[in-house]
Swiss-Prot record:
Stretches the record annotates as Disordered: 187-218
Family: Belongs to the bacterial ribosomal protein bL25 family. CTC subfamily.
NCBIfam families: bL25_bact_ctc, PRK05618.1-2, PRK05943.1
Species in which this protein is naturally found: Anaplasma marginale (strain St. Maries)
The encoding gene: rplY
Biased composition (Low complexity): 202-218
HAMAP family: Ribosomal_bL25_CTC
Gene Ontology molecular-function annotations: 5S rRNA binding; structural constituent of ribosome
GO terms under biological process: translation
Entry function: This is one of the proteins that binds to the 5S RNA in the ribosome where it forms part of the central protuberance.
SUPFAM superfamilies the record matches: Ribosomal protein L25-like
Subunit structure: Part of the 50S ribosomal subunit; part of the 5S rRNA/L5/L18/L25 subcomplex. Contacts the 5S rRNA. Binds to the 5S rRNA independently of L5 and L18.
Keywords associated with the record: Ribonucleoprotein, Ribosomal protein, RNA-binding, rRNA-binding
Protein name: Large ribosomal subunit protein bL25
């Protein structure tokens, strides 16, 4: 999928609400759901459990625009929350939010990390720390990216990658509260520190020997 793509979800308005009605829907292979939005009445809907679960497993359901076809009428929305049964993992309820395609929205976009095993700092024994696996951005609904890439190849021990280091399109703005947060870093491990300490006396001895040789030659 690319910018501007949508995920189609077919749904029907449900007249009845409540625990009993929701239980009956689930028994029939349906998911009770709701769509809400600013200055709009909430709409209670139901959708196919099998179809939606498949989309959850194969598509970026939280970071892509949803085309809700409610009894044949198209509405655009974002998936805001998915509730699942703690044991079976079955989807028990979904919250959608109406989207105005003419206005910018905030959305969480997953980060894809490249070259984790080839990372310069990791190859030298450092520990890779991933601090954020998604990024809250503001953009037009039709410009939501499926994901954002973070290349770790040249990340050295003691260094980090900040949000400002990411190459974001001009049509996209970071909407996180924290100013320029760290996305990933590589820290020195105990083994790396020990290696440094083990090498220090040898370097010191070499330096001392060189100094003594200079004194002798004077």
């Amino acid at each position: 999928m690319s910018h501007g793509d949508t995920i189609r979800v077919d749904a029907s308005v449900r007249a009845k609400c409540g625990t009993g009605s929701a239980r009956a829907l689930r028994a029939a292979g349906l998911i009770p759901a709701v769509v809400y939005g600013k200055n709009r009445d909430a709409v209670n809907i139901s959708l196919s459990h099998a179809d939606f679960l498949k989309k959850c497993r194969t598509l970026p359901i939280f970071s892509q625009l949803i085309k809700l076809c409610i009894d044949g009428k198209e509405e655009f929305a974002l998936t805001k929350e998915i509730q699942k049964h703690p044991v079976s993992g079955a989807v028990s309820h979904v919250d959608f939010q109406f989207v105005d395609r003419g206005a910018e929205i905030k959305v969480e976009v997953p980060l894809v990390f490249l070259n984790e095993q080839k990372c310069a700092g990791v190859k030298l024994g450092g520990a890779l720390n991933i601090l954020h696996r998604s990024l809250l951005i503001r953009c037009a609904p039709d410009a939501i990216p499926q994901s954002l890439e973070v290349d770790l190849l040249d990340l050295a021990i003691g260094h980090s990658i900040h949000v400002s280091d990411l190459a974001l399109p001009e049509t996209m703005q970071v909407a996180m509260k924290e100013e320029n947060p760290v996305i990933a870093s590589v820290s020195a491990t105990a083994a790396v520190e020990e290696a440094k300490e083990d090498g220090a006396p040898e370097e010191s001895a070499q330096g001392q020997g060189a100094a003594e040789a200079q004194e002798t030659n004077k």
